[in-house]
Swiss-Prot record:
InterPro entries: Hjc, Hjc_arc, Restrct_endonuc-II-like, tRNA_endonuc-like_dom_sf. Keywords: DNA damage, DNA recombination, DNA repair, DNA-binding, Endonuclease, Hydrolase, Magnesium, Metal-binding, Nuclease. Transmembrane segments: none annotated. This is Crossover junction endodeoxyribonuclease Hje. Belongs to the Holliday junction resolvase Hjc family. Hje subfamily. A structure-specific endonuclease that resolves Holliday junction (HJ) intermediates during genetic recombination. Acts only on 4-way DNA junctions in a sequence non-specific manner; introduces paired nicks in opposing strands 2 bases 3' of the point of strand exchange only on continuous strands of 4-way junction DNA. Cleaves both mobile and immobile junctions. Plays a more direct role in DNA repair than Hjc. Overexpression of this protein decreases the growth rate, and leads to genomic instability, and global transcriptomic changes. The lineage of its organism: Archaea, Thermoproteota, Thermoprotei, Sulfolobales, Sulfolobaceae. Mg(2+) binds at E10, D39, E52. It catalyses: Endonucleolytic cleavage at a junction such as a reciprocal single-stranded crossover between two homologous DNA duplexes (Holliday junction). The keyword 4Fe-4S does not apply. A second Holliday junction resolving enzyme, Hjc, probably with different substrate specificity exists in this organism. Homodimer.
Length: 135
């Protein structure tokens, strides 16, 4: 991903997250850092999102194992509940899609193996409500 395109996608996603009530920041040095830093991290309630951000005109994008591993390693530094996320802006459909990886491995992210970012927000909201209502 071109560096400027990547920055713009990250900024757009931070704006979307903030619009949904998250505290979200972009970490501009994440790729070059030896530390396990995601492109973006966001918090809301007791949930921490560690996000690898991509943007493509293609119908798929490959995310390398070391990028996915950084998401898990970043989350392991915190005691709060964390979710690793790969967020991809598929430009041909003008839509952000997300995938929650289960382990650190090379992953090919497609429109078909992801959910919309709106669906992610619904899942997270439901999860928060269940935690509040469960004694």
């Amino acid at each position: 991903m071109n560096r400027d395109i990547g920055k713009n996608a990250e900024r757009e996603l931070v704006s979307i997250l903030r619009g949904e009530g998250f505290n979200a920041v972009r970490i501009p040095t994440s790729n070059s850092s030896p530390n396990p830093l995601p492109d973006i991290f966001a918090t809301k309630e007791n949930t921490l999102l560690s996000i690898e951000c991509k943007s493509t005109w293609e119908n798929k994008v490959k995310v390398k194992e070391n990028q996915v591993r950084k998401l898990f390693e970043f989350l392991s530094m915190f005691t709060m509940s964390g979710i690793p996320i790969i967020a991809v802006k598929f430009k041909q459909i003008h839509e952000w899609r997300v995938l929650i990886p289960k382990k650190a491995e090379d992953i090919v992210v497609t429109i078909d193996n992801t959910i919309s970012i709106e669906d992610l927000f619904k899942i997270l909201e439901k999860s928060v409500e269940e935690k509040i209502l469960t004694p």
